[in-house]
Amino acid sequence: RLAAYPDHVWLAVEDDPDDPDGPERLVAGVNGMCTDLPDLTDEMFSRAELHEPDGAWQMIFSVMTAPDRRGEGLAAALVKHVVQEARVSGRRGAVLTAKPELVGFYARLGFRDEGVSQGSTHGGAVWHQMRLTLLTL
């Protein structure tokens, strides 16, 4: 994904306080692709060629935080940043899928739960498709 659409990978890194000249540590990240298709599907995870740089929708595939940094707001800050970039880019909005226990988290960030995803069973899990609409046509 990084090679296919590097402008759609957002990372939070930090210096090691014990080794400030050493390598940075990844503490949180978000990635996804853009498309004119309105719904997130499993096919998008494996087919980077589906990325449309000027696509109407910012799909969010992964939101991750290092276990020892959870609860600090890093994931929320990155998702808000992605939404702001989508807004500035003139996209219609952002779409993600969330496990049931995370629906409330994304709802607090402005995403609306559209129910169980019909297009994604990634990893054999139940996913809720969630959408944050920025522009309506």
Model-derived segments and spans:
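Short loop/turn motifs at secondary-structure junctions and domain boundaries
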Residues: 1-6
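Cytosolic beta-strand hydrophobic patch enriched in CBS
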Residues: 9-15
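Conserved acyl-donor/pantetheine-binding loop and adjacent beta-alpha core of acyl/acetyltransferases
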Residues: 20-25, 29-64, 70, 119-127
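Conserved acetyl-CoA-binding loop-helix of GNAT-fold acetyltransferases
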Residues: 65, 71-84
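Conserved GNAT acetyl-CoA-binding A-motif
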Residues: 79, 85-99
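C-terminal "cap" of GNAT-fold acetyltransferases
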Residues: 99-100, 109, 119-137
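A secondary-structure capping/hinge motif
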Residues: 113-115
